[in-house]
Amino acid sequence: YDWLSKVTGRTLAWGMLTGVRPTKLAMQKLEAGMSRKEVCTFLEQEYGVSHQKAELGIAIAEREKELLGRLDYEQGFSLYVGIPFCPSICSYCSFSSSPLAEWEDRVDDYLKALCQEIRALGERAEERKLNTIYIGGGTPTTLEAEQLFVLLDTIQKSFSFEDLQEFTIEAGRPDSITREKLEVMRRFPVTRISVNPQTMQQKTLDLVGRKHTVQDVKDIFHAARELGFDNINMDLIAGLPGETAEDMRDTLCQIEELSPDSLTVHALAIKRAAKFGQEQRKIDLHSEIEQMVEESARAAERMGLVPYYLYRQKNIAGNFENVGYAK
């Protein structure tokens, strides 16, 4: 890294770190008794991490340590339930999901098998403590309201919620969320949902294949608030095709007006570069995404949100990171 940096005249914000969770390294050093200043110096000198990113990693490691300390590592466990369907596949996405239209006649079969597995797991985990539940995907709200009820009812009947600390449903795309589905969620102890616009620029939503409008995002968010959801996350992506730092600023202004309880900002992971014609985009986007990331951090601070988790991916645009902010 040092040699390449010298030859090219370039440095990377995360230096030579390539792992998914750079906060793990910071946490290991903190748990070993090093001071915050010592950990920062270590990351900068040993791995070439910039001072700004070292401070970010340490701050998040400290918060993660406090949050993870609430979990029971001996008897506790977390449950993840995956719904591998989406209304359509976004151009930038490489997650394991399929368009609902291709599998619509098999969703009931999938749900039946999934519920059977949940009941079996509930029997095996009877003596353990369920700490957190996360229903993700895909897009969980591609399930119809009746199907969503069956899933949530099966989970509730299969596990004790006595030790449950968080129950998240990644409601996801506004074009799959309805008031009826939100009402179903309210019948169960769901504590957190995620409404994910990715951008508030209509031109970009159309370009990447998301079949909803900016107004749809706002309408669903307000409907969730009216129904009593008091922990709503929103996801954004920095570096979507055709977007500028100015577009990101406008998106963030609209998000601030909604005032979500947490915000997750992803730097675009270019895994399907050929589809976008973006092989060069990883290099070209560095300065633009840097501005977007900085604007996001400032917007989060204005909303009273602090960074609490961080992870990185291979081929991430600009060699940046994904950061979650919460109150």
What are these regions (language model features)?
Residues K6-V7, Q45, R187, E226, ...:
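Residues at alpha-helix termini
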Residues E74-D109:
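Canonical Radical SAM [4Fe-4S] cluster-binding loop centered on the CxxxCxxC motif
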Residues S97-S296:
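Conserved non-cysteine loop/helix-boundary elements of the Radical SAM core domain that shape
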Residues L4-T11, E31-L79:
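N-terminal [4Fe-4S]-dependent radical SAM core
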Residues Y1-K37, T41, E279-K327:
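Auxiliary Fe-S-binding modules of radical SAM enzymes
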Residues M27, S78-Y80, T168, I237:
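Short aromatic/hydrophobic contact patches that present stacked aromatics
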Residues T18-K24, Q45, I60-E62, S96, ...:
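Short, conserved phosphate-binding/catalytic loop or strand-edge motifs used
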